[in-house]
Amino acid sequence: GDLVVVRVQESVEPGEIGVAVIGDEATVKRIYSDGNIVRLVPENETMVPIVVMRTDPDFRIGGKVVAVIRKL
């Protein structure tokens, strides 16, 4: 139920929370890059990180999360 405010940009600094787009789905994760490998790490430690190749044509960074608005 939270809303996120995203600054549209093509990259984020390592460990920043961003929006990653894979195919037609978007996900909010901490983003880490190591060469051609990108790890999308969830804040929820019970969830498994997603690993994707930077060169995957279905993958892109959609932007950086700059704020979270929580509903009361």
Regions found by a protein language model. Name each.
Residues 2-72:
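Acidic/glycine-rich C-terminal interaction modules and beta/coil loop segments
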